[in-house]
Amino acid sequence: MIDFEHKLPSLNIDGKRNGTYNNTELAFPSVLTTTDPKLGCFLHKLRSNIYGERTLVFIDGKILMCDKNWIRDHVHVMKAMRHWEYNLDSFLNFIIETQREDGQFYELIKQYDDYHWKLVNEDCYVMYPEDNLTLVRLELEADIEYLVVEGAMYLYRTTGDDEWLKKALPHLEKGIDYITSDEKRWDKERGLVKRPFTIDTWDFTYGKHGSNRKIEDDTPMSIMHGDNSGVYQAMNQLAWFNRRLNNEGKAKEWENRAEELKKNMFKYLWNGKFFIHQLHLNHSGADNLENERLSLSNAYDINRFVTDTEQSRLIIEEYISRRETTNNFAEWFSIDPPYEQFLHYTPGQYVNGAISPFTAGELAKAALNNGYEEYGWDIITRMMKLAERDGTVYFLYNTDSTPQPEGGPSAWGAAALISAVDEGLAGINDIGVNYDEIFFAPKFPVTYYTELRYITGYEVSKSLVDVRYIIKEEGMRYDVYSPAKNIKAHILIPKSKNCSKLLVNSREMNFAVNKVGASIYLDFDINTIDEKPVSIEVLF
């Protein structure tokens, strides 16, 4: 058997500091290595960033926990904070329960004199005079309905509460039915979700004053790929929810609708290398560059599984190619090329070309999971250096790498980076509830770490996944302690190595060899697990 050489956590190994005083790096998720505490400290900074954005809202006799009081930001942050947060449900449930009769969800809660409610028509806000608060939907937004479904998935995986799901599911389905049928939201001719002409998923319209967030007769309308990949993901999530409740017929209906939407996306939005920024419907746009404009949702599209491996790799290759030619310090564009001017933003300002850590996080995860593992790790290490320099991660960066903190929540990018480490680098994916089924696809061989311990789970349900890893000349070993009854393993083999034998709990096991790009993986299933931990040894 390949033996582990050190116990973790520890403060010093072989005369080198490899841990922190008082183990500040320990939480969900966290990593301890025998080499240095850099990755663990990076995760700690990201968690602290998200903790710092946590607030409470008191409305209609309820106490809501929000990580920003916009459900969009909150859901994007849920992909990380689900691991430690005890109050994941209050804000999400409030948004679900206040759903408009036609299926539209509201999105944000603001003080009465923060006049977001004046930016829209009366049917897009609700007043709470006793609390001096308003509940608002910026009408031009086309991402809320699918994000509520995404948030429901994060919540349900931490609870497995079928009674909650039975109550919530009709609302979730009604929301997706609304966004795919309402004449303001749906382009019937092309079978795709539409929105006013904005920069990717943002909330201001080209050629309109910033105080107008409505959809009107003269609003320039376009189709943006990210809205549609989000709805595609939501449809597949609704299928999964229905299957959990033994509604097989409904599950297949949602899967069929998802496939039709995907077909339309590729028919109208795919340029052979990536998804174009916007397909304009009733106007000619700002210039003639939309077909070559790479917007941030391309990285999200991959992680929503609307692209297959080959298509995903083409998108990643476009980012790699632009890294070589850009004058920016990094290729994690909000949009590239930027517009000459969009609203009052000039190139490099805000989402008109600033560099985005949420793009970095999503792109790193996509690369790690699609055969560009070294590139994914490179993105993480570059973000680690920025966080070491600044002490945190910012919402956006200027093209010269100086922070551009105004305009949005830095927690959004922090969450995307945590997810890249957790579901990409560590490759621990909950495909059931409370990690009772795991897709295990670790990529640690692309790092310089030779021995480590990685810990993740859900604090609220006391679900713990604890992985030990070591690599030596003769092979590598993973010990996985988890609640999983079944593990689908997808194990990366280091470059220039081959597997001579696979052992699971000291018993030889068959495997399939799977090539992803130039990377080689061993695929096998471990079922009806009754031994803890599961020990996986790959002998070279």
Across the structure, where does each feature detected by a protein language model lie?
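Solvent-exposed loop and edge beta-strand segments that line ligand/cofactor-binding
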Residues: 4-24, 56-83, 130-143, 213-230, ...
